[in-house]
């Protein structure tokens, strides 16, 4: 049997007995209790060492007032007890905060949770990462179950329930995973509100032997274990909001719960429920192994970059000093701290940093010998000055992509470049890091290849073993510093200011002062074996990180393996290097805001009338400080190896999907069309361009692209360059696709939503999206969709059979292999021009986009070169997307979008299915913004009130009502067709597009999956962002109907959830029945393909049947031998007991005889 078939066969055998365990039974007694929780028990901002009264920002959250709650709230949390009397509480570490106790288990173990609810409303406990049946899911939603299977869904006040969870091999950490995986548990009656109320805790599942036999168990592979929740805890969603207002506001009647400033004061930017450094100290020893279990929860604003100052983390084999955390994202990071001291942990998202998401951790020497100095490399000296300049965001004066004047009236660019008595225009005072030749700071360094750096400082480069020495001269008017990522430094050289208890509260240069920084690159700071040869990092000023970086002080830093840099300091094996910073530079938060307003001679009377519009005009959506393709053109040759070093910075809206039009890139050996950036994250993407022409680099988030976050790169055929071998293609597959206009219903059946919420219509979360009352449009909209036809006559639609039913609004799943030519014959049967444009493929047209007018037929040819298919670390197939690109934003929101999968050669079978999978599902998670559809006015006329003119299209409620939080165009479990059999191999193509709010963390209940990045990693949540396309694979193991949903709070309530069903193996014998509230549909089993036979629920090639039978026979014989051996042991024990009884009987008789004789 081939290794791939053997692997899947063994995985399937494992799924046959998911609950067979050979480990311990770990029993926990958890009580749900109401408590009073203080987010800042020390009563001050610990980071700045300021009392609340003198800290304006901290006091806005923590000081109570007549209409402010302050820093103390009633919450409901999980507590652990020693037994079922629930009287003797188990003490928890103080730093765990309001989190529930840490639940721990190994593979093969059973976890029994005795849950008792001492609170005043129903709650549950629902886990991630473990196996459970319906009676232990702890999640309330309509799933067709009843009776005892629903008892776990809602434990009433005073009630109790026992939850039974197991950790079978199908949920175990993989070989590539760390010894223990990070998960969570939480209440799931109304999950967003339950969690906001406080019901959440950590859970780890470990490999066998990772835990010792103590109670509670301790890990044997690490010395310290820490669990941190990063979350903007929204107390406005707490079940106790009204009670908290009544208790803590001195004038409760004056409170307006809809007031935005009141709501903001209740959003606590917390780590484990503590803000502004109030988290009790996290202590550890230098040179000891530390495991950090990091997780997030919350809403769209919960984009977190946790920065560990002074140390290095390892996650999934890669070195980093930051961790990206999103709602229901779990990160397991390992650290061996080297530098003693008190260090900062902070979320580097600007607004979160400002609002208190910071804590301290302390590394003690613990009498350890100081580490051996392993710095055997060079001392690399840099002379860098902070220099104030006037910066022009659009020096060309026109859009480099379209040629239009930036100040063209009515254009989007005019909003940013208009110069008037109420607008500054495109030129601002800023400050920039600049490189000089020596310590005299007389002669600047000018390199032609650095022209594209723009506002960025010079590139600092070093290899492992090197020392970086930076002489920093602050020639600006504010104190500034230099704080690096990715290198080591002692406390004396740290560039961030905070209260660490030392005499060095941050090395900062005052105006016209020089300071020297010393950073080192020991071996444990360099790239790992899984990392590329060079790692991309960043340095920035952190005297005031938010104002300093918005003023312009940021630059790139490159750390490479020893020998990776040439004599000229450039990376070997790379022809071109480009460093690009994607950020919305907020000039309102610059040190020079007042100076810029004064220089523009603004009329402050006009400003006061439109302060919001003025502030928005100062938020510059820039790449290296340039908008609308004004970045100097990035030139390269066809076949070059190009390294793109990408940097992120900013606030929670700075979620950037960096798209490379015309060519693809590799990230860590995985093929991508986009690289995701968040504040203080860094990515290196490798491109080998094979597509000649001029293309855009842009942020995929639609509003960012519209606002000018675009640049141009050019690929030329250069003389003297060795021609790359020409890829050979062969005609392979033809698709006939029509754009047709339909009436689309996002939620044709509201029964699931109504049963789930069990509320009146107006009180339902879905009312605003689904009602057609009060001037709202309801759930039905005119849209345009891609649909497949049988041939070029476009007369017979290709029917969507069972496997395609789930596609919903999406066009057909187009598939190809490397080396194929895909031909798409497109007929536009809609009422306006549309096109078909695909990511990832090599489009043969020289005109982009090639549009079809209404009634016109256009043929597209897509070649599939090697760089379109899976990279060395990818799965067998990678997912892409296609859509109409005449107006990419309006066309897509109108409905014209579909999935595309490109596979390795030989993976696809003649009928188009994958030979290595039994099922394939393509899911698009997108907030369809009907306000940006071409058909908005028609929809208002058709579905609005009788007088369409009475509807205010800019009304906030109306705008929100038209944002449909959909999975394949359906809300509230209306998507059908996600059905599979137990033991089947399932590939999920997970797609996301849209805006910065399209942050989606998708959780599969009851199942885990494998995510491939060179190695396989276990997860049950996949993170999606605009322009990201992921492939995850699972073996369906748990029969039942289960929930799949986005874990972002607002998205849950808005209906971004659906059901998938796993049918048991016995149901293979009968038609597969999908029960809905509308009708019952029978979906016949898939046909058995020629040359295959069906065994164990799988289609097995005939040539492998004998081998699989042999494996099954061997397993059967092994089990038989085990049974015989156990039987022998039992017989032997029984015989020994019988002999002992006989001996005792003989002895008794002997004693009696002796007694008688005496």
From Swiss-Prot:
Disulfide bridge positions per record: 180-206, 285-366, 534-560, 637-718, 877-903
Effect of residue 269 to A: Decreased affinity for Fe(2+) and decreased ferroxidase activity. Loss of affinity for Fe(2+) and loss of ferroxidase activity
InterPro entries, sorted: Ceruloplasmin-like_CuRO_5, Cu-oxidase-like_N, Cu-oxidase_C, Cu-oxidase_fam, Cu_oxidase_CS, Cu_oxidase_Cu_BS, Cupredoxin
Manner of cofactor binding, per the entry note: Binds 6 Cu cations per monomer.
Consequence of substituting residue 621 to A: Decreased affinity for Fe(2+) and decreased ferroxidase activity
Reactions this protein catalyses: 4 Fe(2+) + O2 + 4 H(+) = 4 Fe(3+) + 2 H2O
Binding residues for Cu(2+) 5: 656, 699, 704, 709
Name this polypeptide is given: Hephaestin
Organism this protein belongs to: Homo sapiens
